[in-house]
Structure formats: C-alpha cells, structure tokens
Amino acid sequence: MKSKATIEVASAQMKQGAILAANQYKEKGKVRYEKKAESEFFVDNSALAGFTGERILYMAIRELIENSLDSCESNYILPNISISFKLLDPANDMWLISCEDNGIGIPSDKVPVAVCSFLTSGKYVEKQQRGLFGVGLKMIAAFSTKDTDIPLNVWSKSAEEEETEYYFELRTDIGTNKPIVLTKKLLKANERQIQGKSGFKIEAVLRARLSPITKNKIYEYVSQTSIVNPYAILVFETEEGKVVFNRRTEIMPQPAQEVLPHPGGMDLKILKKAIMNFMNQKTTLLGVLCNSFQKVSNEKAKEIITKAGVGIKSADKYSENELIKIVNICKQTKFQIPNTDHLSPIGEEILTAGMLSEYTIVTNKEVNTNEQQPRLSVKILKPVLTAYSSRTCVVNNRPTIVECGIAYGGDISSFKLHRFANKIPLLYDEGSDVAREVISEVEINKMGISKKEVKEQFANQESKSDRAVELLPIHIFFHICSTKIPYKTAGKESIASEGDLKKYMKSCLTDLYRKVSAQIRKELRMKDAESRLRLYRHYIPLIVNAISESINVDPNKLSEAFSRIAENHIKGEFTEPYITKKEDKITDERIEKEVEEITEVEGEVTKHKRISPTVGAERRMIKKFTKRYSKKKSRKAEVKDPVKEDQIA
C-alpha cells in the first residue's frame, strides 16, 4: 500500500505535467511575427520578377541588356553591348553569362549595393525607364549565391572617377539583404577589361535549364531589341556561334527626363513625401503644391487649399485628416494634361530604320559537325513599304505616347506582331496583351479591301488564324512609352487595357491600314493581271494558227505581236516609240506608244490613257479575228481550257 507522501508527490508531478502541457498548447496557439529581408522575399517569390523555371536564363540576359541600354542612353552614348552565355557544367545545368557595355558605369563605392542589395536603385523617380523595380541585377546576384559557390565578377569604370577601373568579387547575404565583398581591387592599365572611357562588365554563373523554346526566345529578344534600338551595336555570342547586329543609324532619341508627379494621381503617401522634401525650408503647403507637382499654379494651389478648408500654414503643421482633404480635392479638380516633352519615344526616323533592316537570328540546322562553321547567322528582312503613326494620351494621370509601325512585303512572308514597352520587347503572354485585342478589333476593311479578297490572294497554309490581316505578309509594331507602363504582372510581359490606351492604339493602326492600302490593292490588281495574261498566252497560239494563213502573215511575227499587245494591255502602257505612219500593219515591229496624262488630285496620282487610232485599229483587228475564230470553233468540238482545269483541280 502506497504511503501518503508518495501519493502527494505523484499528485504534484501530475499537476506540473498538466501545467507544462497547457503552457505548450498556449505557445503553439500563438502567432510568431518575423521580419523577412527583401532579398529573401524575392528569392522565395522569384516568379514576381519572372525568374522561374526555364525563364531564369532568358530573364538574366534581358535584365543585363536593359541595364546596359539605360546606362548608355542616360548620357547620350551610342551603345556598344556584348552579351554571351555558354554551358559550364552540363551535368548540373551551370551557365556562365557575361555582359559588357560602354555606359556611364557605377562609382566604385556604390557597386556592391547597386549589384547585390534589393530595392536599392537609381530608378525610383518619376521618369520613363526600362526598369520597373530595380531588382533585375540583384536577382542574378542572389540566384548565383543561392545555387553556386562562384562569386559575381564585376568590372566598373565610372565617368565620375577619371577613368579608373575597379574589379569586384561579390556575393549576396540573402538573410540580411547586404552585399558580401570578397575582393575589391583597383586595376592597373595592363589589367583593365573595359576599353572605353567608361563602362561596366559582369560575369555570373547561374543554374538554369535551357529548352529549345527558351533558347529561341533569347534569340528573338536580342533580334527585337535591335529593331527598336537600331543606333546600338549588339554582339551576341553562344556556343553555336557569334552574330553582330550592326548600327543602322547614329540618331538617338532624346534621353528621358525626370518629371514632377501630376496632381491628378496624388495620394497621401506622395503628398507626405513632398512635404518631407521641404521640411528644412519651413515652406507652406502652398509652396509645396506649386513646387512638387506639375500643372499647379499659385492660383490653383490657393483654390485647392480654400476648397479643402484647411487654411494656409507651414506644411508640417497639417494633420493627416487635413492632408486627406487636400488629396480628395485634387482628385476632384480638373488639371491640364501632363507634359510629354520629358518622355523618350523611338520616333519615326529611328523606328523606320529598324523596320527597313529587320535583323533576325537564324539557326543553320544543316551544319556538318566536323566543320568549324557557326550555326548562328543573321538574316535581314527588307520590306517594300513601311509606315508610322503615333498618338499622345493620358493613362492613369500619366502621359503616354503610343507609336505604331507597319512593315509590308519584300522579304516578309507572314504576319507577326511585335510588342514593345519603353523600348523593351515583350515576348510572352501575347494573347492577353492589349495589342492583340487591338489587332482583333480593327477590321481589315480599313484598308479598302475585303476579307474575301485577302483570303483568296494571300492564302497561307502555315497560318492557323482565320483573321484576314494575319494572312498578309505584314509585321505590326506597337510601342508604348510612359513613366509607368500598366503591366499586368511584375514580369513585364503584357500590358493591360487601361484608360483610353486601346482607343489610341486603334487610331494609330487605322492610320497605318490606310497608308498601306494602296500598295496592297496594287498587288491584288497585279495578281489579277497575271492571271489574265496567262489566259491570253494560252489562246494566242490557237488564234495565230487559225488566222495566219488567211491573212498571209508569218505566224512567228503574228504571235510575237499578239503577245506584246497582250502584255502592254495588261500593264496599261505601251513602251515602244511613237509611230506616225498612217498605214500600219499588226506585224510591224514598232508599236505606237500610249500617251499618258498624269494628274494629281488630293494626293492621289491618276493616269489617263490616250490611244491613237492606229493602236485602236490593231485592237479592233485582234477582237475581230478572235470573235471569228471563236464562232468557227464553236461549231466544232469544244477545246478544253487547261487554265480552268488547273483551277478546278
């Protein structure tokens, strides 16, 4: 039998166990709050920046090229960019990518932070630029740190440091969002990698899978970048070969300028930031509104403050409730449209230069593996016609310029839609882009031709679409430039239809359809004429055999004359010298030239033909003998028409 003391000890232990269990249960029920570093967040959610799956290598090359172009254009430097990637370790999918440019470079004290620290960038201003979040280069550094033990190699020669070049070996501390500087070295003259006065070079090793589809996307991205940046030299190198996209023009667009925000898009955060910028100057709210926002005059600012009923005092003396009233009044007030002179569109001359020599990378699949012949080459597509149109609009209280171009015919054999935003090619998610909606909604009859004509004359077995415009040999280019592009996702691959954006894109495309309509109608007439000429050539030998003996004329000369008249009739002009003889035979080698009177009415050139009686007599003779021959043959067995039989077949 247990003693009383033993029972008490056991009871106490049971109570302690119950209390401990209750405390543990309470701890499990509590929510733990932790702060995650920016770098850790983006690495864990890499799809937000597009770095996912097979697109890692594509996004890395894209970000490097865009950074290089921004660096050159910001200081009005004609870009020379070299980009390469090669497979280091096939078993582990390790790739070495390298990019070098002749831009302004990065000061040596800013290189580690600019390359490795997330949300640290010079792009967080109201300005048109390719970058959106300033995370592209940081994602490359973080992924290199996460998947490999090889640091980033960086060379930088900044224009601010009198042509001194520094070399860095860097990694990212993903847990703290801070750079790890393994090496920093001032290079001697014989150790320098960058040839120009300034520039930037980076080498990184990434783990990434590369499928044939992704590889083609990389090739297409580089090709399309050269279209909207024809003033740049792009050198692109892979294990399959090296290609160079030459500079087609030395004209560069004016660099984009920083601009004050528009008051129509004001919110509490923007207003507080504007007040903080004037905190040391003890400025009134009136001064803050006039100096921190565009299109706000002194009278307009007074009107806003009066309507809000908050009075004029030092900007830092307003409560949050009073500032909210200011924001609400600004959203209700009508302001002038934002300025567009700070934007940097491509422009007609530059885009036309890109369209006239459209570079595209071609993979040679017939190369012998034993030969040292490169698989990659550049094909240049030259159209017969290009056209350009642009519109200025406001989207979400931000100025936006819509540019549209068309390249038609020539080396272009099929339809293709090119999409660009702030001079960046957009290759993915075309089906959800506003440009695809515009193509679908603007009908082909804007060209003055019917869908039936297009489908009959431009039937393309490779085209899977039943839309008439997609049967034409035509490339359509859409470019949107703004201080903030309405992307659908952070990956910057498709643009949303916001505000009046679609309306102005439709207007541009309609303009271009009208401009190319004359060329398309001309080609349709030429195809019809060729069909009729084949028919004439089929019947001419039959007519010559029937009438040559009755009129005692050499069949060869008669056939030649008939063929010449048929060709000139189809072309609508006679090219032989003028004949003044009254007596003229159909077999004479000289045929009178048709006289053309050319007039221009409202920009339309028209030709009026004046045919001499001699030529008219010749045509009447042909018609007479053709009619007589047709009646004669109708009494005999019908002669089969091989042209029609071919058409039926």
Language model features with spans:
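Charged regulatory segments coupled to nucleotide-binding catalytic modules in large multidomain enzymes
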Residues: 2-20, 35, 209-231, 241-273, ...
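Bergerat-fold GHKL ATPase/HATPase_c domain
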Residues: 2-78, 109-116, 254, 259-265
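ATP-lid-like helix-loop hinge signature
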Residues: 68-98
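Acidic ATP/Mg2+-coordinating residue in the GHKL
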Residues: 101
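A short glycine-centered beta->alpha linker in the GHKL/HATPase_c
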Residues: 105-107
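Helix-hairpin-helix
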Residues: 288-306
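C-terminal extensions
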Residues: 319-391
